[in-house]
Amino acid sequence: SQYDNGQLWRVGDQAATDAAFKSAAHVTKIDLINNRLIPNAMETRAAIGYYDTGTEHYTLYTTSQNPHVARLVISAFHGLAPEHKLRVIAPDVGGGFGSKIFIYGEEVTCVWASKRIGGRPIKWTADRSEAFLSDAHGRDHVSHAELAMDASGKIVGLKVHTVAAMGAYLSTFSSCVPTYLYATLLSGQYNIPNIYAEVDAVYTNTAPVDAYRGAGRPEATYL
């Protein structure tokens, strides 16, 4: 990466794409910004954590779009409890759009704290300001693209360099969104024989980004 706070990801045949550009009759260039956005569902995130002192089992009610993954991640990476002693239930999720796939610290804290106070359930609901500040955001790409064409106007090559802001730390699927779910789909419905893409994923002092409404595919379609 050209940035100290980033990682570079590449896909495509750079040599073949460079050759296509070298022999092209026309080359057009464009710079695009895909703005950062906040999902802002009408129903904010909420969680209830409960620890059963008799069975030593944990139960988490949470507005998660992916309760099975939440159970796996909370068990494997947060070390709260083995999976067979942890239930994650997603009743009324409300609007999600991808932002409720990420495993948030508040959910884990509710079940962790319930054990610390003798098994009393703990409820947490985000207010609107918290949702704006802490929910996983979406998009935030700055891209430079070049398109090569032959004399008849047929596309023979595409080069793309995208700077994707990851936020202060990685969320559940953030590294997949601007790479495999974006750069591999840049051709869209067109037959482009040579494509080379570079993605600079950089850390920024902002909320982390994650999957949002198509997760990389809309960004590719826009470009």
Where are these regions (language model features)?
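Structural alpha/beta core scaffold segments of enzyme domains
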Residues: 1-223
